[in-house]
Amino acid sequence: MPEAGPFGWYSDWWNHGAGGPPAWETFHLRELRRLLERDYGAGHRRVVAGLSMGGFGALSYAARNRGMFRAAASYSGVVHPLHDGFPEGIMAGLVEFGEDPLALWGDPVAQRRIWEAHDPYYLVGRLRHTPVFLSVGDGRAGPFDPPGVFDELEAELSLQNHLVAARMERVGVQLTTDFYGPGTHTWPYWERELHRSLPMLLRGLRG
């Protein structure tokens, strides 16, 4: 996934109903896509993959724009931002980056419809015809970590990914998972999972 700012969430921000910038989804899928096609020879067979917040973006973009991507992969992705307690973390992060915590998708209760419209957990039905790869660790120290560490974020994302995977299986999404147990929210795992998902992504590009 291309960059979406330090905390942009691959979304066109609500901004209390006013819209306007930042508009990451529009930028990536309209402006940047057209530039790549026009000036760099990018084709119309596309796949999308991302890690952490980018994993959210990969699934959200694929679900919200059906037919644009032939496969989607998420590595330790935030795949259910409405999961218990997580909206508060997102809003706290927005404040930490100097943003209005309600500008992204609004209040998770009052504007729940907007949150659900971006949350892959609620969009799995729109991925029925898109092969999906999900991978995540469980937060315990794995082969790339010093002994004894525990990663609370990765443990939370493990819960989210298991919930989304179960929902995908119920609606018939063509799903591949690598829930590899011990592992933290760090680059060595994501690099390994990119290699593991590459055959699926390449099949999507080849059609």
Model features per residue range: what roles?
Residues 1-207:
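Non-catalytic cap/lid and distal C-terminal segments of serine-dependent acyl enzymes
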